[in-house]
Amino acid sequence: MDTPERDSLPRKRSLRKKFGARNYDENLMDELIEKHLGGAFKKKKQTKEDLEKETETEAMIAISLGFPIDALLEEEIRAGVVRQLGGKEQNDYIVVRNHILARWRSNVEVWLSKGQIKETVSNEYEHLISAAYDFLLYNGYINFGVLLPLTSPMPELTNEGSVIIVGAGLAGLSAAKQLMSFGFKVIVLEGRNRPGGRVYTQKMGKKGQFAAVDLGGSVITGIHANPLGVLARQLSIPLHKVRDNCPLYKPDGAPVDKGIDSNIELIHNKLLDKVMELRKIMGGFANDISLGSVLERLRQLYGVARSTEERQLLDWHLANLEYANAGCLSDLSATFWDQDDPYEMGGDHCFLAGGNWRLIKALCEGVPIFYGKTVNTIRYGHDGIAVIVGEQVFEADMVLCTVPLGVLKKRTIRFEPELPGRKLEAIERMGFGLLNKVAMVFPHVFWGEDLDTFGCLSEHSNKRGEFFLFYGNHTVSGGAALIALVAGEAAQMFENSDPSMLLHRVLSVLRGIYNPKGVDVPDPIQTICTRWGGDPFSYGSYSHVRVQSSGNDYDILAENVGGRLFFAGEATTRQYPATMHGAFLSGLREASRILSANRSQQNNSRKSLPKNLGINNDTLIGLFKWPDLTFGNFSFISNPLTEDPNSMGIMRVTFDSCGDDLKEELENSFQRPLNLPLQLYTVLSREQAESLQLVTGGDDIKLSHLTRNLGLKLMGPSALVNFGSSLISTIASSRKGRGRNRVSSGKI
């Protein structure tokens, strides 16, 4: 999973309000630009009043994106965007920077060039245009996302080196897109047979009653300045605001008294305020104390929540805290559990229509991803890196590891040499907890079309997180989908519980609430119980700050090793941990760091030059004279020195003729007219090639299976030689002499 990340309601649940609008308008930035700038950026000749108005509006946009109104970001200072801090040059830089941000936000669907900025800014600021544009571009503030060119439109960024990315979650995919736009050769190795990691949308239900349900990360937490909002905008995907109305019910199904509810909510928030006061007084002594122990001691000290109903209500709020942090309160640091609060994205929490898979699918477009590749070892050194998957060895200049913290804790990937001690200690200290779900699709919506969330209290404190909150996904899933959340200690017990018993319990809760109202609760059409803790590709849900840990550990985990080994993922960002947008932003961050490190190595003349420079189209033509496998218009070659079904090879597809629809699809893919006959290629495993041969039907059906079911992309011979030169070289050399026994299937 690359994030069931913290898709919660605000930690301090606000007073529940009346129903809001059903669909959230994500075009607020467009409206702001239209209102204040007339919808278009003007040329250089403007009145003084026009310039002042434009500058003020662009400053508003920059602030909404997290930039200070009259200062530089720390990253800008480190990048040396101005020669001297303070003064006129810095002020001018900020105005130019804000203009570039506003200019790109006015149309996030196209690449914004430096030349376009020069059209609207005076020539005297050309050096500031370059400084601001380069900083914003390379740090992922502009020209990111989907619908942008995968290859760099800038000539200076056409041969930056090669990177292997481990993990095809949000972090890995955002980094891949960005690195490819920078001119890097990139491949992604994914252990699962699907992309997305901890973001996983499952099609549930039956014919005529299907629903797209997010079993992992589901809520976009705070839409203001959220990069996932940009992706949704680029793809024209509507967002649905999670409405504030969240009625609570007692264990017997009766509604909670609103007066008691409001009072306990106030007590809960005051207890958290007291924790903040207490830790200031205690200083460093509070580092060894859990949030749970402090809250319980304060509750006893002030004598609050004494009655059964009050205690159950307080437990509901505590379960919500455990949900927000994917951890038991007894594990959370009283000092640093909320260290990321100052950085939280503003605005509403939203669901994405059709599920977050739509973002993942768009991010995968054009990115070479190899599925079913469970990484065993990552070797790194001065000359480059090697990623080992079974008997396969993939080589490149650098590697970006985006696996979840739970995988790093399990030490299932061997690093050679071993990771630095401070990084290993940070991995050990950090917390990685659980959130599980019971996802159900019903014949119809019985809980109310105007309700997004409702909650249920528990009789027992140790089970307070079991089905404590329900999300109605009917507004975005396409069906009557309802999700029950399981947090805290209950999420751990959930892992080993019988699914049929879990379903029986959750239906008992629902029927206890709705049957007394005269509402029949039908049996669900389909039910899925998640088990993120036992998932070997995640071993949990998302990170939190455990006792004796701090936000510094996120920074340590994000540190690269030797300028060759890099790390991304929600557990590497102290500002946005446990969120989908945090994972996405960490990928952009590491793309920038990889670019910087690669250029530094180039300047020091230490870059490892790619081998196999003698490979060309003639080599490829020669190899396919004697294919290992031929069926219809498909030919396959591979390394004859191994019988491993997972060993990689090359498939050639010959198009002697094709229908108008297929030809149009191919021409759209390659963005140019194509002449027949035509030969295209892809890289796949021997097992995939053999399975393709067994697909019944003609070549058209096999081609559809290749591109849609296997998710493979066809490329021309030049692109294949550029991308898979080492694989071609390995196959060629193994055919000449059979003395080698190591399979190198991925030097890029």
Annotate each PLM feature.
Residues 105-109:
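Short helix-capping/hinge SLiMs at alpha-helix to coil transitions
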Residues 198, 623-646:
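A short, well-structured beta->alpha microelement
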Residues 659-692:
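Mid-chain, well-packed structural core segment of small domains
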Residues 402-403, 652-654:
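Short, well-ordered coil/turn residues at beta-beta hairpins
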Residues 45-70, 75, 112-118, 139-608, ...:
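FAD-dinucleotide binding site
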Residues 694-743:
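Class I S-adenosyl-L-methionine
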Residues 85, 115-126:
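Short helix-coil junctions and helix-kink-helix linkers
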Residues 1-100, 126-140, 144, 148, ...:
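Long, charge-rich, low-complexity intrinsically disordered regions
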